Amino acid sequence: MMHLLFALLLSALPCWVWAQACSDEARAHVSTLAEQIRQWDDSYHRLGQSPVSDELYDQARQRLAQWHQCFPAPTATPNTPLASSRGAQPHPVAHTGLEKLLDEHAVDAWLGTRKDVWIQPKVDGVAVTLVYQQGRLRQVISRGDGVMGHDWSASARKIPGIVQQLPDPIDLVLQGELYWRLDDHVQSASGGLNARSKVAGLMNRKHLGDTDAAGIGLFVWAWPQGPAAFTERLSTLKRWGFTDTQRFSQPIRNISEAAHWRAYWYGHPLPFASDGVVLHQAQHAPAERWQVSTPYWAAAWKYPTTKALALVRDVQFKIGRTGRITPMLELEPVRLDDRQISRVSAGSLKRWQSLDIRPGDHVSISLAGQVIPRLDEVILRSSTRADLPVPNPGKFHALSCWQLDPGCEEQLLARLSWLSGNQGLALPHIGRETWSVLIQAGLIAGFLDWLTLDTAELANIDGFGDRTRARVVDSFHSARQRPFAQWLKALGVPPAARNNLEGDWQTLVARDTQAWLAIDGIGPGRAAQLSAFFRDPHVQALAETLRVAGIDGF
């Protein structure tokens, strides 16, 4: 079923998306991703640990399915996520899986072919089978591989949240989720808090203490041989003591009602962690026909994605005006909160070095403040560690790259963009693109070369028509009328001096570190920066150029 779903999804993708998914780079990473998913499966199902969030895991599986579509391997071993968790105890009724509906359109389509549907939170815990004989709890079996699990009966008998004796002497099989009790837990604000791993770890112990046992609850989500009417199932379960099921079950008729409850449970307090909602059709197959596969009568709709798994295509190093080096990760485009993300900052050179991110790695990204893409962590490393042209941080600083020396284009371009921006001279019609064109045309090799450009020199630049040339030249000429204080900002004077300026350039140059320290609000570090700036030979040469050009204050 899932194979068919992925095939349908891929067939609907635009050609450019298919090309990216089936790139040569992807071919090299198929086996690495498959092995990582196998390890995650083993940790999750056998050890009860979640080394990666569910949403990143789901995306990794989806990506692997895409790549297998691109690069089929006839001899590949089928992937069985639950294989390592198989136990020795057979389930009386198999545990089915859940089809994961990707969006509202998929949910709407699913609802359109079903009736008498109910919705519940998708409790983030560990699945179990409960077997009652003559009303007494006889056995609790971990999910395992869905057919065979582990006997957790001894620990289960210590858990107050599990009904030990039913009021009716009935033989009964239930399926549900053991969860860790949380007080007023809001999933959208707090996430999963590793609640599932905690329960799994406790249940896998040889001895479960009373305090830990009291922290475990039970949510029954299936009564395979129960009455046909969903309402009767709920009321009976409540009468027997399984109160969560009725409390957190709602009938729905359409996508609007499904979306309402999904948003409500995501943003309102619950006594457990959850990672989405589950849609149940009241009518289901007879219990003896249940299999470890996705059934037609139930499906999951996960909560909104807060993280995206992204493949790194390249790492570029941007050098800013002050010489700060910022590694930028170029990504295979991914969607996050209805936005397409194709690049993200690694923050600082030091952080990039500590993470050691290379092309071919998979990283987790999220949105800071729901707006700015943010790098979280490396999820999977490529076995091939590509060499990268990492800039030497010792060569770039606040006083480097006033000219187009080797390796200086990035910083010089950043300086010019600052100069023409609102924080500098506020030159109309002049931005980073304009400066880049002028540099590529060979008309600018130094910070102030543009001061003497005229219309004739701009005549041979492709894309510069008469109107553009006239606007650029007029903007450059207007710079000569800017006041001295504005020019100082454009040059990049350290900020502490901008509101404490008295006198012209010569007055400022004459101040040494002690003189700067005497000004209120300027500490030793800033004083040293100011002194170094005004005494730097390159800066003094720029000041002389501005003096000759007749700029105020120089």
UniProtKB/Swiss-Prot annotation:
GO terms for molecular function: DNA ligase (NAD+) activity. Its EC number is 6.5.1.2. The active site is at K122. It is an enzyme of class 6 (ligase). It catalyses: NAD(+) + (deoxyribonucleotide)n-3'-hydroxyl + 5'-phospho-(deoxyribonucleotide)m = (deoxyribonucleotide)n+m + AMP + beta-nicotinamide D-nucleotide. It comes from the Bacteria. InterPro entries: DNA_ligase, DNA_ligase_B, DNAligase_adenylation, DNAligase_N, NA-bd_OB-fold, NAD_dep_DNA_ligaseB, NAD_DNA_ligase_OB, RuvA_2-like. The keyword Phosphoprotein does not apply. GO terms for biological process: DNA repair; DNA replication. SMART domains: LIGANc (SM00532). Keywords: DNA damage, DNA repair, DNA replication, Ligase, NAD. It holds the Pfam family DNA_ligase_OB. Catalyzes the formation of phosphodiester linkages between 5'-phosphoryl and 3'-hydroxyl groups in double-stranded DNA using NAD as a coenzyme and as the energy source for the reaction. Belongs to the NAD-dependent DNA ligase family. LigB subfamily. PANTHER family: DNA LIGASE (PTHR47810), DNA LIGASE B (PTHR47810:SF1). This is DNA ligase B. It comes from Pseudomonas fluorescens (strain SBW25). The gene is ligB.
